[in-house]
């Protein structure tokens, strides 16, 4: 079934088994499916609940909240915060201006660019944070590598440890950050895996 709507329309949909997709620019969107994929180009504030299925949104003008039992989640540039709960599958976020929170049981987590704080935890998988410039970062995994990119001009306070793995701090040592410097506080822990902190 195909429905034509004016640009910026608010959309909600629920199906038991089937895919939901939207092209062009939509307004606020709320979708729910028991089994099926959700694919959007551009939406306003977004909420998606699916028991099994992939979720893709190329861009979100507002906050994004995604829940999936099993599936891959990919969110493009988001003008707001992002919250993802993904029990089984990888999660990829291009960029977010607000806070990012991701919880996963089995899957890798990747955030290319974070404009605020990040909390990402997975039981089995690696976590990569491409760039963070401010706020608080908390990363944790039982089995997997952690990688954190600190933006140029940002001072970092680090509290990181790996029970079985190498910790590499590639940042230059400094004494105290200037009052005008951006600061990020990083807490990262992995039981089995390496940790790398670098400039982005």
Region roles according to the model:
Residues 1-200:
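Intrinsically disordered, low-complexity terminal regions
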């Amino acid at each position: 079934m195909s429905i034509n709507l004016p640009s910026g329309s608010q959309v909600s949909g629920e199906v038991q088994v089937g895919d939901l997709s939207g092209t062009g620019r939509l307004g606020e969107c709320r979708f729910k499916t028991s089994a099926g994929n959700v694919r959007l180009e551009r939406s306003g504030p977004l909420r998606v609940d699916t028991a099994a299925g992939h979720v893709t949104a190329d861009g979100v003008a507002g906050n994004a909240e995604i829940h999936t039992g099993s599936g891959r989640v990919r969110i493009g540039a988001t003008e707001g915060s992002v919250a993802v709960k993904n029990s089984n599958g990888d999660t990829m976020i291009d960029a977010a201006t607000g806070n990012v929170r991701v919880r996963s049981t089995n899957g890798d987590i990747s955030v290319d660019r974070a404009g605020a704080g990040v909390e990402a935890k997975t039981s089995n998988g690696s976590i990569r944070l491409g760039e963070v410039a401010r706020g608080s970062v908390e990363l944790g995994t039982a089995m997997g590598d952690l990688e954190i990119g600190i933006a140029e001009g940002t001072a970092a306070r680090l509290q990181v440890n790996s029970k079985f793995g190498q910790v590499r701090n590639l940042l230059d040592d400094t004494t105290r950050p200037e009052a005008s410097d951006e600061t990020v506080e990083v807490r990262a822990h992995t039981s089995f895996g390496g940790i790398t902190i670098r400039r982005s």
